[in-house]
Amino acid sequence: MELTPREKDKLLLFTAGLVAERRRARGLKLNYPEAIALISCEIMEGARDGRTVAELMSYGRTILTAEDVMEGVPEMITDIQVECTFPDGTKLVSIHDPIV
């Protein structure tokens, strides 16, 4: 199977998101990379499901709370930007202060 660098990046991010999802389900607090991966995956999947950029920007702030992550992680993540493929093209979804 031949993958472009972009496809490899998406696959790696999705894999990290699955690991984060499983750890969260076991009750573990997520670290910085896991939190980024989980939020990014949820946003990419939302785009695939047909949600709008505005909906995803709002939804991105509800995925994780400070209780879901290790101490200090919310302060480290001020912005997340995810490039998503929508039916009308590729767009950048920005989530400001995603963990409250």
UniProtKB/Swiss-Prot annotation:
Conditions for induction: By urea.
- Where does this protein act, in terms of pathway? Nitrogen metabolism; urea degradation; CO(2) and NH(3) from urea (urease route): step 1/1
Compartments annotated for it: namely: Cytoplasm
A GO CC term attached to the entry: cytoplasm
Q: Does the keyword Amino-acid biosynthesis apply?
A: no
Q: Which GO terms describe its molecular function?
A: nickel cation binding; urease activity
Q: Which reaction does it catalyse?
A: urea + 2 H2O + H(+) = hydrogencarbonate + 2 NH4(+)
This chain belongs to which protein, by name?
Answer: Urease subunit gamma
Species, as recorded? Vibrio parahaemolyticus
Q: What is the name of the gene encoding this protein?
A: ureA
